[in-house]
């Protein structure tokens, strides 16, 4: 009989004493509360510099899983780019310089697209502002902005403030015009809803979609129709004569300034894959010799990379594999890349002895319509694996508290927490029945704050600490832990030596 050591990541499950707007506190969760009271527990920091982000920056799933899997603080793309701007290296970046040289020589346009907010999860508008300043410095005349509106990592109705900030930089530099506006629901889909991506592509390339004289007018009209930032229809900004300010054409260059890959891949593929088949792009398929991605998005995206990946050696998955242990990664679609690619330090391939189980997320418009998502199917599949004695190490993600938490709606999020708790109980009982040990934690908060103090929906992640429980009564845990300390703790429990690259410290005293 194998005695599995399982890491259970309750995505978006933060801890906060205040119960107002706190779906985690208001939900009935007898299993979690029981384990918290019965077993050694502590809290971990999952935001800011503890996970390689700027101070005070909320954590997110990509960052959380990278830090957990690496067993160290992993300096994030946001921090890397910020430092490059601060130290003057950003403007010297060869990939940016090559794109600028190309448009200057050919007299073509430079298009900047990405998520326009200061959420810092997928992008940061300061990086786009740095690109505007660089373009101005280098004498690029035609610079067009294709703004993806957020409303998810920031407040749901905040787009206007980011448009205003952009207009200030346009005024300061003398370059840049808004060309298209679209909500991230369309431009940043990651679930193969290609009909959404197609609307965005057609606006950018063909000038198809609702037309407005300004970005401000687009947002105002959307709000008047009850459509907020995330869901704004891909729209085209037009000149006085109703012609598009700009479309993307042959020999133009693109800099896609999102730094997080998962929601950038699909739209990038439409522009970079010659044999793209997910939808018919129509007669006009612009040839873009310089398509620049801020970071490495995927092998499926044929673009240049401005900030190339940093190699993360000896992640938990690799160390476990080298020790000859069998490991399982399991999640539903929305969090599958997190327990595989991100947890393995940005590696797509499996390690020897690694098995992966993907359970499809339900096809609903938004997850508040189905707060349980596919958690029961994930749980059934995992309990079956545990009972069959197949794995020494299990990495599980329950997506609900995060994905439903993003709705900013209390009732569905409470249901999500309660479904998570029910399934947590089933998984932990199966592990304990095999004399195994479960480590229960989260990658960041979300469901712990669903309402602002004004009673408005709070759709973003939080900076609250996350739980850490070890279902083993003969250990003592220290305070001040961070996500990067989880892997060393697991290795302690497994009796496997911690490699020098893992600079985290075990939480077991």
UniProtKB/Swiss-Prot annotation:
Q: Sorted alphabetically, which Pfam families does this protein's record hold?
A: iPGM_N, Metalloenzyme
Residues that bind Mn(2+) 2, according to the entry?
Answer: 11, 61, 443-444
Which cofactors must be present for this protein to function?
Mn(2+)
Q: What class of enzyme is it?
A: isomerase
Give me the residues that bind substrate, please. 122, 152-153, 184, 190, 260-263, 335
Coiled coil location: none
UniProt superkingdom: Bacteria
Q: Does the keyword Lyase apply?
A: no
- Swiss-Prot/TrEMBL GO biological process terms: carbohydrate metabolic process; glucose catabolic process; glycolytic process; sporulation resulting in formation of a cellular spore
Q: In which pathway does it act?
A: Carbohydrate degradation; glycolysis; pyruvate from D-glyceraldehyde 3-phosphate: step 3/5
Under the heading SUPFAM superfamilies, the entry gives: 2,3-Bisphosphoglycerate-independent phosphoglycerate mutase, substrate-binding domain, Alkaline phosphatase-like
Subunit description: Monomer.
Spell out the family assignment given in the record's similarity comment. Answer: Belongs to the BPG-independent phosphoglycerate mutase family.
* Function, as annotated: Essential for rapid growth and for sporulation. Catalyzes the interconversion of 2-phosphoglycerate and 3-phosphoglycerate.
What name appears for this protein in its UniProt entry? 2,3-bisphosphoglycerate-independent phosphoglycerate mutase
Q: Which gene encodes it?
A: gpmI
């Amino acid at each position: 009989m194998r005695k599995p050591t399982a890491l259970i990541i309750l995505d978006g499950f933060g801890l906060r004493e205040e119960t107002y707007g706190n779906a985690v506190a208001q939900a009935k969760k007898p299993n979690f509360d029981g384990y918290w009271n019965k077993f050694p527990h502590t809290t971990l920091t999952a935001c800011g510099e503890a996970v390689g982000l700027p101070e005070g920056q909320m954590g997110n799933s990509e960052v959380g899983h990278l830090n957990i899997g690496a067993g160290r603080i992993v300096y994030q793309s946001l921090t890397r780019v910020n430092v490059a701007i601060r130290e003057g290296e950003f403007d010297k970046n060869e990939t940016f310089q090559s794109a600028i040289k190309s448009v200057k020589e050919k007299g073509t346009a430079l298009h900047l697209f990405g998520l326009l907010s200061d959420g810092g999860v997928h992008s940061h508008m300061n990086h786009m502002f740095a690109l505007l300043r660089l373009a101005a410095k280098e004498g690029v005349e035609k610079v067009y902005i294709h703004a993806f509106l957020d409303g998810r990592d920031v407040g749901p109705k905040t787009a206007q403030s980011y448009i205003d900030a952009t207009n200030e930089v346009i005024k300061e530099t003398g370059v840049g015009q808004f060309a298209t506006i679209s909500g991230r629901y369309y431009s940043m889909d990651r679930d193969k809803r290609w009909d959404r991506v197609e609307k965005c592509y057609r606006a950018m390339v063909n000038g198809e979609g609702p037309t407005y004289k300004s970005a401000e007018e687009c947002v105002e009209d959307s709000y008047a129709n009850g459509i907020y930032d995330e869901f704004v229809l891909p729209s085209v900004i037009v000149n006085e004569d109703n012609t598009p300010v700009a479309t993307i054409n042959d020999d133009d260059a693109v800099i896609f300034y999102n730094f997080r890959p998962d929601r950038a891949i699909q739209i990038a593929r439409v522009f970079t894959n010659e044999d793209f088949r997910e939808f018919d792009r129509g007669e006009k398929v612009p040839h873009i010799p310089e398509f620049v991605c801020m970071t490495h998005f995927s092998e499926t995206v044929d673009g240049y990379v401005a900030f190339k990946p940093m190699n993360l050696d000896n992640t938990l998955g690799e160390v476990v594999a080298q020790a000859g242990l069998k490991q399982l990664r399991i999640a539903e679609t929305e969090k599958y890349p997190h327990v595989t690619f991100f947890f393995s330090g940005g590696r797509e391939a499996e390690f020897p002895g690694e098995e992966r189980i993907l359970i499809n997320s339900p096809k609903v418009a938004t997850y508040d319509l189905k707060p349980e998502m596919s958690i029961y199917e994930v749980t059934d599949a995992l309990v079956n694996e545990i009972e069959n004695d197949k794995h020494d190490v299990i990495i599980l993600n329950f997506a609900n508290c995060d994905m439903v938490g993003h709705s900013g709606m209390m009732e569905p999020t409470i249901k999500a927490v309660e479904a998570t708790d029910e399934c947590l109980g089933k998984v932990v009982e199966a592990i304990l029945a095999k004399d195994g040990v479960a480590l229960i934690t989260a990658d960041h908060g979300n469901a712990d704050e669903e309402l602002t103090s004004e009673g408005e929906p709070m759709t973003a992640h939080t900076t609250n600490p996350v739980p850490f429980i070890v279902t083993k009564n003969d250990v003592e845990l220290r305070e001040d832990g961070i996500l990067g300390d989880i892997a060393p703790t697991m290795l302690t429990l497994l009796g496997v030596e911690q490699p020098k690259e893992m600079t985290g410290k075990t939480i077991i005293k």
